[in-house]
Amino acid sequence: MNFNINILGTGGTRPLHNRYLTSVLIEYHGESFLFDCGEATQMSLRKQKISWQKIKVICITHLHADHITGLLGIVMLMAQSGDTRKEPLTIIGPIGIKKYLDANIELLRVHKNYDIIYKEIIINKTEPILYEDKKKRIEYIKLKHSIECVGYLFIEKDKPGKFNTQKAESLNIPKGPIRKTLQEGHEVILNGKKILPSEILGESQKGLKFAYITDTAYFEELSTHIKNFNLVIIESTFKNDLKDEAKKKLHLTAKLAAKITKKANVYQTGLIHFSERYTLNKDLCELLDEAQQEYPNGEIFLTKDGMRLKANKDKFIIK
């Protein structure tokens, strides 16, 4: 299965020497989708030997510096790597993302040899589905932060079951476009008779569901958007002893992050966006322990810079 999740950075506020700012990149069947792009994100791409030219869509959660200041560098990098990029780059984010990037491009006279397609989100007005093709879609959900902020859902569509050749032959379905249409999950009319995909396909395989959630305060409704997701990468900025500060700054503690995914019956929870005050392994282990105590039956782990997760059936395996 060609579905990988790369952790480019796990920190908040500013990059540290061993922890870049929070950013996640999905590789899906030869295409890449980048979520947030803080300062030094391109350094993470280089370190992990990930091609920036394969990035098809960049999704920005909100317009705070630690989630956006690396965006111009990525745009320049794509242009400076020769004329190899042919397709446009889609950039998705809250209102203001276009103004921010266009102003920087104009002021710095950035040369780019490809088009940028902007999709600005007007929360509660923009339709939830932002991107869609035959295999997947990207949706947004409203979060609760000091400025407009969204989380992103990357949803793989269910895959049709195995094609039963013997059954197809017994129904006199010819090889070619008609069989392909059925394999893609669409009904056909053959000799005046309707044939359903279920007649010649085995049981369909459920697509994987992934969510990227940062920065946000706790609110009850959040869990409803990620019900039964396979993997949720969610901010865990503070330990529980700073829960009042988390509430004031509209962030989550590790305990609250686990409470959200527990309520949603999430299969795997990855903690991310750690406060810069937590530089010791001991501190991070305490974050993890607090989350695991809240959701003892869930699979919870600390994300790390450079971590790569590979899809395997209904879960993701750390490589």
From Swiss-Prot:
Binds 2 Zn(2+) ions. Zn(2+) 2 binds at D66, H67, D215, H273. It holds the Pfam family Lactamase_B_2. It is an enzyme of class 3 (hydrolase). It comes from the Bacteria. The active site is at D66. Its EC number is 3.1.26.11. It catalyses: Endonucleolytic cleavage of RNA, removing extra 3' nucleotides from tRNA precursor, generating 3' termini of tRNAs. A 3'-hydroxy group is left at the tRNA terminus and a 5'-phosphoryl group is left at the trailer molecule. GO terms for molecular function: 3'-tRNA processing endoribonuclease activity; zinc ion binding. Coiled coil: none annotated. The keyword RNA-binding does not apply. Zn(2+) 1 binds at H62, H64, H145, D215. Keywords: Endonuclease, Hydrolase, Metal-binding, Nuclease, tRNA processing, Zinc. Signal peptide: none annotated. Its cofactor is Zn(2+). InterPro entries: Metallo-B-lactamas (IPR001279), RibonucZ/Hydroxyglut_hydro (IPR036866), RNase_Z/BN (IPR013471). Homodimer. Belongs to the RNase Z family. PANTHER family: ZINC PHOSPHODIESTERASE ELAC PROTEIN 1. Zinc phosphodiesterase, which displays some tRNA 3'-processing endonuclease activity. Probably involved in tRNA maturation, by removing a 3'-trailer from precursor tRNA. NCBIfam families: PRK00055.1-3, RNase_Z. This is Ribonuclease Z. It comes from Borrelia hermsii (strain HS1 / DAH).
